[in-house]
Amino acid sequence: MFHFLALTPLAHSEGFGLNTNILETNILNLAAVFALLAYVGTDFVSSLLKTRKESILKSLRDADERYQDAVNQLKQALQELETARTNAAEIRRQSEINAEAIRQRLELLTQEEMARLEEAKETIIKLEEEKAVAEVCTKVISMALVRAEKKIISSMDEAMHRRVMDMYLNLLREVY
């Protein structure tokens, strides 16, 4: 409505009325609208800009807060990772030390067992040799005694034969 109303007096002193000249009315109307907007709109636009600025600043603060939280979580995760790596390295080192100690202990036990088995083998061989020598000696002595007995029997009379037999029997009794 205001666009077509002009506050200019009419040429024929008719009073106030409708001005249909577009060039005159537009400039005046635009000036009035701009003045009204400048007076009323500054507070409104200023309020809108202030609200928008506060909203943007709040969003930036929230984003910065989330960024700081993410950075802190990353730092904590990196510290935990480093701690885990350190623990893993320590466990690996201890495992290697334990494995080496077990290997050395097993090697020592194996050497001791081999020495014990070698000693047992030597003892068994020696005992078997002694047993074989004793058996051979017993057989040789038995055969020699049988041969000597046959020789003596063939060359002796009965009295001599009894004395020799008694003597050998006494010797055998003393030995066994």
Curated annotation (Swiss-Prot):
Principal place of residence: plastid
Xref: Pfam families: ATP-synt_B
Record keyword Thylakoid present: yes
Entry GO CC: chloroplast thylakoid membrane; proton-transporting ATP synthase complex
The entry's keywords: ATP synthesis, ATP-binding, CF(0), Chloroplast, Hydrogen ion transport, Ion transport, Membrane, Nucleotide-binding, Plastid, Thylakoid, Transmembrane, Transmembrane helix, Transport
Subcellular location as annotated: Plastid, Chloroplast thylakoid membrane
Membrane topology listed for this record: Single-pass membrane protein
Record's keyword annotation contains Lipoprotein: no
Residue ranges crossing the lipid bilayer per the database entry: 27-49
Molecular function as annotated in GO: ATP binding; proton-transporting ATP synthase activity, rotational mechanism
Family affiliation: Belongs to the ATPase B chain family.
Physiological role: F(1)F(0) ATP synthase produces ATP from ADP in the presence of a proton or sodium gradient. F-type ATPases consist of two structural domains, F(1) containing the extramembraneous catalytic core and F(0) containing the membrane proton channel, linked together by a central stalk and a peripheral stalk. During catalysis, ATP synthesis in the catalytic domain of F(1) is coupled via a rotary mechanism of the central stalk subunits to proton translocation. Component of the F(0) channel, it forms part of the peripheral stalk, linking F(1) to F(0).
PANTHER family documented for this protein: ATP SYNTHASE SUBUNIT B, CHLOROPLASTIC
Binding partners and assembly: F-type ATPases have 2 components, F(1) - the catalytic core - and F(0) - the membrane proton channel. F(1) has five subunits: alpha(3), beta(3), gamma(1), delta(1), epsilon(1). F(0) has four main subunits: a(1), b(1), b'(1) and c(10-14). The alpha and beta chains form an alternating ring which encloses part of the gamma chain. F(1) is attached to F(0) by a central stalk formed by the gamma and epsilon chains, while a peripheral stalk is formed by the delta, b and b' chains.
Extra remark beyond the main annotation: In plastids the F-type ATPase is also known as CF(1)CF(0).
Name of the protein in question: ATP synthase subunit b, chloroplastic
Gene: atpF
